[in-house]
Amino acid sequence: MRPEIAVLDIQGQYRVYTEFYRADAAENTIILINGSLATTASFAQTVRNLHPQFNVVLFDQPYSGKSKPHNRQERLISKETEAHILLELIEHFQADHVMSFSWGGASTLLALAHQPRYVKKAVVSSFSPVINEPMRDYLDRGCQYLAACDRYQVGNLVNDTIGKHLPSLFKRFNYRHVSSLDSHEYAQMHFHINQVLEHDLERALQGARNINIPVLFINGERDEYTTVEDARQFSKHVGRSQFSVIRDAGHFLDMENKTACENTRNVMLGFLKPTVREPRQRYQPVQQGQHAFAI
């Protein structure tokens, strides 16, 4: 399953690496939005869950992954800017659906508040309108380690917290990925954490009141950081919100085990294609280079 690769110019300011997994029989296209500093490799399992029922689009933010060499990294990028990049990609690919993971949910909600004309449904996974105590501790420690450029501590942070339920092989890839990032990527992550702690999430929630499409919020039963109970508070902000719980899953959902993978896939397809029963996809273990890092 080889994607069509393109590097797109976004309003003359950024160049964004994209992968388009075309499915000839698919009628709809979905864009996947990852957490900060995660790359297209993080969505390998999700692509297998959604393709070939959908055309699937992956992309790297200008500061990360395969977009990184195409941009000068002269300035930090806000969640609002990420939202505008997403809107450009939605327009370019004429995407019918979007799906976000973890803190990719902030830019996704900001983009959906603009009511993009093509998008009919959205899935927001492992995200919460509440920064609870475990998440605040995670963000505070992340801010401290990133400011000090402490690669060892940054490399272990995700595995010890939101990634605690991941298979050991995923954790090794996470550590290798995070501890080898460029200094500008650490600065970008530090900037995003400060945005969150300085009420950037509140701005996203205020805009969410403008969202006029169905949005499914998916959270793991074992996730202490974006809990099922906290996620349900999205009903106060998103008018057409729905909620699903993935049993035996933590923050990383379909990456964690076979049962969670199958349950996540069934929930996603049940929401996005409710009239169609799809054949079950086989769960495939992590491949070389795949990581689960997100913030």
Curated annotation (Swiss-Prot):
* Pathway(s) where this gene product acts: Polyester biosynthesis; polyhydroxyalkanoate biosynthesis
Q: Which keywords does this Swiss-Prot/TrEMBL entry list?
A: Transferase
What the entry lists under Gene3D superfamilies is as follows:
alpha/beta hydrolase
Q: Which residues form the AB hydrolase-1 domain?
A: 28-254
Q: Which InterPro entries match?
A: AB_hydrolase_1, AB_hydrolase_fold, Carboxylesterase_BioH
**Which top EC class applies here?**
transferase
The EC number(s) given in the record are 2.4.1.-
GO terms of molecular function: transferase activity
Membrane-spanning residues: none
PANTHER family according to UniProt: HYDROLASE ALPHA/BETA FOLD FAMILY (PTHR43194), PIMELOYL-[ACYL-CARRIER PROTEIN] METHYL ESTER ESTERASE (PTHR43194:SF5)
Q: What does this protein do?
A: Catalyzes the transfer of the acyl moiety from in vitro synthesized 3-hydroxydecanoyl-CoA to acyl carrier protein.
The name on file for this protein is (R)-3-hydroxydecanoyl-ACP:CoA transacylase
Q: What organism is listed for this UniProt entry?
A: Pseudomonas putida (strain ATCC 47054 / DSM 6125 / CFBP 8728 / NCIMB 11950 / KT2440)
